[in-house]
């Protein structure tokens, strides 16, 4: 069974293509030609009136939309350059305007085939000078309905490359009405050569369309291009690994002041090196977190947690930790402010006063530590010294004896420079003068020197 057939010509093909791209009903297209042929036997004229079904043309979406290099190719063929010849149907898609004023002989809405629905129309025409002298090209249009309007160039002239070589240029112009009123009519004009201005008498191609309001128009292909771009972005974007948030910027570790007496503490630390206990703990915490980040960064990829719900959960936990840390810092500042008003703080603000029993126990621990070091040194040297009286004895005597000796210390004046700490003392502890709790720690440390 033979399929359906129709008689067509170049005009009908071009008309169908233009109608397929338009928003109007293709069934209401007015044909400008009626293709026909004669029967070779009886010379009967055969046309499409004998066909039961009208020729459906081409599906909606088929359009003539050449790229910039393709337009330059058609322009070269129209001008007879580079040995090119025009396509037999090119006049149906890019008609030639032969008026004396070129494309500016009338308002763009009056040009053949031009519509205001956003479809594009192409025209061949020659470049014409506006005046007999000079090089300025004609841009002004005399219109009885809209008055004088003019095409104004916008932006810079862009080169058009064909087969790796610049063969033409492109200009973009906008139509302005009276009193510099901008319209939605846009024209892209193409000419041959590498110069910005076209030569008089040479053919140019003008692509004219009525730009639709941006809020009402969705450009064809934008949605598909956006989806493709998202797919490409997802394919090339590396998977993000969760990172433990840093609560504070790590700072160089500084020595902590352990003595309030300036003449003793100067041997160990300087006032500028002093940091509070809270700052030290915060710096140590930050260093531990940085070490964890470095360990995670050198783990193999298959051991790393993948992004997804776990990543979101990790980020939420990190944000929560940062908020908690901020609250803790505020509380620390409040505590520092309260500490300045509390008389139980030292002048240095670094230690809280201990009661007598706690102080004795702390000194006992320090003395045991120093004693163990002395025993190790004596063992290594092969000699063994007798046990010497030490501060730890007060842990067995009780706090009352310690308080009494401290009170007596305030009444006795003694020069500590003549004391030899390496020999057993010939005096009671009450004969020594202690300035503060830190003095005991510094004095105990001096045994190891």
Swiss-Prot record:
NAC domain location, by residue? 58-211
**Assigned GO CC terms:** nucleus
Q: Does the keyword Phosphoprotein apply?
A: yes
Q: What happens after mutating residue 356 to A?
A: Loss of hyperphosphorylation
Modified how: Phosphorylated in a DNA stress-independent manner. Hyperphosphorylated on SQ motifs upon double-strand breaks, H(2)O(2) or zeocin treatments. Hyperphosphorylation is required for SOG1 function, and unlike constitutive phosphorylation, is ATM dependent.
**Any keyword Phosphoprotein?**
yes
Q: Where is this region: Disordered?
A: 324-348
Q: Pfam families annotated for this entry? A: NAM (PF02365)
Q: What induces it, per record?
A: Not induced by zeocin or ionizing radiation treatment.
Q: Which InterPro entries match?
A: NAC-dom, NAC_dom_sf, SOG1-like
Mutation effect (residue 372 to A): Loss of hyperphosphorylation
* Documented effect of changing residue 155 to R: In sog1-1; loss of rapid transcriptional response to gamma radiation
Keywords assigned by UniProt, alphabetized: DNA-binding, Nucleus, Phosphoprotein, Transcription, Transcription regulation
| MF term (GO), any | transcription cis-regulatory region binding
Bias (Basic and acidic residues) occurs at: 324-336
**Outcome when changing residue 430 to A:** Loss of hyperphosphorylation
One GO BP annotation is: response to gamma radiation
Q: What does this protein do?
A: Transcription factor regulating the transcriptional activation response to gamma irradiation. Required for stem-cell death induced by UVB or by gamma irradiation. Not required for ATM activation, but participates in pathways governed by both ATM and ATR sensor kinases. Involved in DNA damage response (DDR) system that regulates cell cycle arrest. Functional homolog of animal p53. Regulates SMR5 and SMR7 transcription. Regulates DNA repair and cytokinin signaling separately and plays a key role in controlling lateral root formation under genotoxic stress.
Notes on the domains = The NAC domain includes a DNA-binding domain and a dimerization domain.
Tell me the protein's name: SUPPRESSOR OF GAMMA RESPONSE 1
Q: What is the organism of origin for this protein?
A: Arabidopsis thaliana
